[in-house]
């Protein structure tokens, strides 16, 4: 039996609803609920989730438990409602309603299994979530093709997606490994690192590790607190072997992390204060690389403002990753192959300390989970006035 109380408490921690779950207080349109079941079932499949959820009793803006009075057992057109839903949904889907109590308030959870093999339809129409809305997937051919591809072949990964570029070289990869005391052998390194698809083509992982990954990775510095401020500089670290790019970005953290002299309340000696916590920066950057959705062709983005650094990775948490588990350090990497490489090269240790190191310094609010990205924001500790010249 699922712990629906824990599920709800986990989902309300998200800053915004995602395509595989929906919050409402008392809204209940019986036919439209069937459309939502189709949409959420298909969205859950696209996200690699086992189930999606429609939850009543939660404010959909503030994500606060408010309780609900919905009656999901009343008949629809003289037919038992759940029988009506089951009759209209195809293929057969074992959805279920559950009543729970949280903080003394009634909450109703509709558990919706993800689509398997073929998309879930309601009344002959296949729906999908686009943002917070539900749409007929036939109106979006690319999304429909993606849904069928996921249902047939599974979620795309770094090692299953063919690279756009096939003329790849790996001189820098060999040098990097040698610098870590590991010898790669020309005759078997591609197989050992898993750099080709089943069809024998170079995959995205190979492209990332090649001498030119064809992905720009930039650190942008603005003079003010927003991107509307004057742009001070842009440093380019991409378009090389990803491992080298990561090292350079971590080293650049030392350059921008100004050490300030704090003479306030000075008695015996000056106090040196770093602009931000270097360990937290390192962990946030590595975390962004491991969880970034590289298969879409987009790299993480690091932006420095006058009062903070924002480290953005594309995509969302891994399907098996819960929000609470993420904060506890029970990490499920989005890119398992890349995570394995980082472990082998001692870039990360997979001990579960990365995220807790960040939250210990800055708290959980340092992370923002957006619809298609995760942002870690490290605020600056500023002594006096600092300006970028």
Predicted regions and their residues:
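Polybasic/polar functional segments that serve as interface/processing modules
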Residues: 1-95, 99-108, 116-118, 275
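Phosphate-interacting basic helix/loop segments used at nucleotide- and nucleic-acid interfaces
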Residues: 26-49, 186-194, 268, 283, ...
């Amino acid at each position: 039996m699922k712990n629906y109380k824990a599920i709800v408490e986990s989902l309300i921690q998200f800053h915004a609803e995602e395509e595989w779950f929906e919050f409402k207080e008392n809204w209940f349109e019986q036919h439209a609920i069937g459309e939502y079941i189709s949409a959420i079932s298909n969205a859950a499949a696209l996200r690699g989730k086992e189930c999606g959820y429609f939850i009543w009793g939660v404010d959909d803006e503030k994500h606060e438990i408010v309780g609900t009075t919905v009656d999901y057992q009343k008949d629809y057109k003289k037919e038992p409602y759940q029988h009506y839903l089951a009759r209209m949904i195809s293929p057969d889907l074992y959805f279920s309603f559950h009543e729970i109590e949280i903080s003394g308030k009634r909450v109703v959870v509709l558990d919706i299994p993800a689509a398997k093999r073929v998309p879930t339809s309601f009344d002959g129409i296949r729906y999908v979530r686009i943002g917070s809305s539900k749409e007929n997937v036939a109106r979006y051919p690319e999304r429909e093709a993606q849904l069928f591809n996921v249902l047939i072949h599974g979620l795309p990964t770094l090692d299953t997606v063919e690279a756009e570029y096939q003329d790849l070289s790996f001189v820098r990869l060999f040098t990097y490994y040698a610098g870590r005391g590991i010898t790669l052998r020309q005759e078997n390194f591609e197989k050992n690192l898993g750099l080709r698809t089943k069809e024998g083509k170079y995959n995205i992982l190979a492209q990332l590790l090649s001498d030119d990954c064809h992905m720009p990775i930039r650190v942008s510095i603005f003079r003010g607190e927003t991107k509307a401020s004057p742009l001070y500089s842009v440093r380019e670290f991409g378009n090389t072997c990803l491992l080298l790019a990561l090292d350079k970005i971590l080293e650049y953290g030392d350059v921008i992390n100004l050490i300030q002299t704090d003479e306030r309340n000075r008695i015996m000696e000056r106090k040196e204060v770093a602009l931000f916590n270097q360990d937290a920066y390192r962990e946030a950057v590595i975390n962004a690389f491991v969880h970034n959705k590289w298969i879409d062709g987009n790299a993480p983005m690091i932006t420095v403002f006058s009062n903070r650094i924002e480290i953005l990775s594309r995509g969302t948490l891994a399907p098996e990753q819960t929000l609470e588990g993420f904060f506890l350090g029970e990490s499920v990497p989005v890119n398992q192959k890349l995570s394995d490489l980082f472990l082998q090269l001692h870039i990360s240790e997979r001990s579960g300390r990365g995220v807790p190191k960040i939250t210990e310094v800055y708290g959980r609010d340092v992370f923002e989970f957006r619809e298609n990205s995760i942002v870690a924001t490290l605020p600056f500790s500023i002594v006096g006035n600092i300006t970028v010249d």
